[in-house]
Amino acid sequence: MLMPKRVKYRREHRGKMRGRAKGGTEVTFGEFGLQAQNASWITNRQIEAARRAMTRYMKRGGKVWIKIFPSKPYTAKPLEVRMGSGKGAPEGWVAVVKPGKVMFEIAGVSEEVAREALRLAAHKLPVKCKFVKREENGGESNEN
């Protein structure tokens, strides 16, 4: 299960999920990717379930990159506890995902296999997802 080795603070504010993803919006490592279409928290358990679904479908073929990391702790109070008396205990870890973020990448398999593996992974996640391919820079050069 993914989680930070150590954190500076045990509890965090929930925060707002406004706007689109700043970085990580393109396929960089692999050939195909799974891109988020809306914002959500994705838990470390959901990330692991998606990873297992992909690797199981690809059977030993190909390579998978997980481009999100659950670095935000979320807290919960026990059931049937009255309001107040402090913030709850840390319950788990989440990755904040905004629209446009590429969450998983795959390489080393055909497009049909990658499409199906990423579709299976998308079913494990609480966000609407889109299959994306790597864009090759055609002829454009930034060098002077």
UniProtKB/Swiss-Prot annotation:
This is Large ribosomal subunit protein uL16. Part of the 50S ribosomal subunit. Belongs to the universal ribosomal protein uL16 family. Signal peptide: none annotated. It comes from the Bacteria. Pfam families: Ribosomal_L16. GO terms for molecular function: rRNA binding; structural constituent of ribosome; tRNA binding. InterPro entries: Ribosomal_uL16, Ribosomal_uL16_bact-type, Ribosomal_uL16_CS, Ribosomal_uL16_dom, Ribosomal_uL16_sf. CDD domains: Ribosomal_L16_L10e. GO terms for cellular component: cytosolic large ribosomal subunit. Binds 23S rRNA and is also seen to make contacts with the A and possibly P site tRNAs. Gene3D superfamilies: Ribosomal protein L10e/L16 (3.90.1170.10). Keywords: Ribonucleoprotein, Ribosomal protein, RNA-binding, rRNA-binding, tRNA-binding.
